[in-house]
């Protein structure tokens, strides 16, 4: 495939996209619900509405949906960026400014929104980067996760990069494309550029920048943790996929349905994908949430994220580098869950895996004001923030950005 950021690369026509997707779905053993590509997004939204997902404000995990992973190749200059606007986020506290800006670089351009808390601090603030799932927006994701309220409580900034329909018709982050899985290219480079720009403007503590996401956003968060280990101190992945779990549309569809579940290492990955693939190499603190009734992105993907993280830690710390314990409990909303903690020798959590029993493809403990939320589960947002802010990070004099 040609470099998608080359000025000579034309955009795919809808007919070509349609034919490509049809072949990909057939290869993955799936069947498309839409007859024409231009109607696919509307069809997906209509199908999701009864389950209270996009297009509905009901909060229910009862049904899952198909995530459209179709990608459109775009020239950075072709990206349409709307004018900068401001909106007011109305949370439990007094209204505060929730600003929209845009970022452009040689690798591409994206809009983003960011939240700066009113709470003042004598020290540089931390920052959490939130990557939405398919069909979502920054406003939708902020409402569903309530991350802005947590930012106000703890005094950190929040950045919400937005995928564009020009880059992906369903606004999915292109986690499944090889050029979007590497450093200094594609979407990882654009998101890293946004993060550095906001951090420089607002005096963010460069040791305390974290990234989290849902579904396609979680898969991209995992990629960012691997490709920019010096920029992101930790990762939060909710209903996501492991690093380099796919390299094109057919392998993406297979991975989502559990095609790589239980496979470990580069050799196994190559057998599953039919091609060589990358292996996570950086030991990075990570917290993973996944519902065990998720039929959109199978739970085995969350387990594989944990396995990749464990392998990276073992490579750097030795086989006995982490101590494992498991807890069983129930959330105030009623859902039971299992929490597995992998801690270092000092008892500090480095890898956490939360399995939410009976939950589907939705943000656990989320607000019904946003899509893809399940208010009955443990509060994923609060637990991710707790995990991030409790990390023992290196002092400024040994940190290199």
Regions found by a protein language model. Give the residues of each.
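The conserved beta1-alpha1 loop
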Residues: 129-135, 239, 290, 357
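Conserved alpha/beta-hydrolase "acid-adjacent" motif
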Residues: 296-301, 364
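Short substrate-entry loop that stabilizes the transition state in hydrolases
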Residues: 119-125, 131-169, 245, 362-363
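Cap/lid segment of the alpha/beta-hydrolase catalytic domain
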Residues: 162-186
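Short beta-strand/loop motif that positions the catalytic acidic residue
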Residues: 288-290, 294
């Amino acid at each position: 495939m040609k470099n998608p950021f080359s000025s000579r690369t034309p955009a795919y026509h809808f007919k070509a996209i349609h034919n490509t997707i049809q072949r990909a779905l057939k290869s993955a053993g799936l069947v498309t619900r839409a007859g024409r590509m231009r109607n696919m997004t509307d069809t997906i939204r209509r199908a999701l509405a009864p389950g209270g997902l996009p297009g509905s404000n009901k909060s229910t995990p009862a049904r899952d949906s198909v995530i459209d992973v179709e990608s459109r190749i775009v020239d950075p200059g072709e990206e349409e960026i709307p004018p900068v606007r401001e909106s007011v986020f109305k949370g439990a506290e007094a209204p505060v400014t929730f600003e929209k800006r845009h970022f452009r670089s040689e690798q591409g351009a994206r809009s983003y929104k960011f939240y700066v808390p009113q709470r003042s601090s004598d020290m540089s603030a931390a920052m959490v980067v939130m990557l939405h799932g398919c069909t979502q927006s920054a406003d939708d994701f902020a409402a569903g996760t309530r991350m802005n309220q947590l930012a106000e409580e703890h005094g950190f900034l929040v950045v919400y990069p937005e995928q564009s329909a020009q880059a992906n018709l369903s606004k999915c982050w292109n986690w499944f494309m090889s050029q979007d899985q590497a450093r200094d290219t594609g979407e990882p480079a654009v998101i890293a550029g946004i993060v550095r720009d906001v951090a420089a403007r607002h005096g963010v503590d460069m040791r305390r920048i974290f990234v989290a996401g849902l579904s396609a956003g979680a898969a991209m968060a995992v990629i960012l943790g691997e490709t920019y280990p010096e920029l992101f101190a930790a990762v939060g992945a909710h209903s996501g996929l492991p690093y380099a779990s796919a390299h094109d549309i057919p392998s993406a569809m297979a991975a989502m349905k559990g095609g790589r579940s239980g496979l470990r290492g580069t050799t196994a990955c190559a057998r599953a994908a039919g091609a060589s693939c990358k292996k996570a190499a950086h030991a990075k603190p990570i917290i993973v949430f996944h519902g065990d009734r998720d039929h959109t992105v199978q739970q085995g993907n969350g387990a594989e994220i944990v396995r990749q993280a464990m392998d990276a830690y073992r490579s750097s710390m030795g086989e006995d580098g982490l101590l494992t314990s498991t807890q069983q409990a129930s959330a105030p909303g009623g859902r039971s869950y299992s929490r597995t903690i992998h801690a270092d020798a000092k008892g500090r959590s480095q890898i956490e895996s939360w399995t939410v029993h009976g939950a589907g493809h939705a943000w656990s403990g989320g607000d019904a004001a946003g899509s893809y939320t399940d208010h009955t589960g443990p509060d994923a947002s609060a637990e991710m923030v707790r995990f991030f802010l409790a990390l023992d990070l290196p002092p400024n004099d040994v940190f290199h950005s």
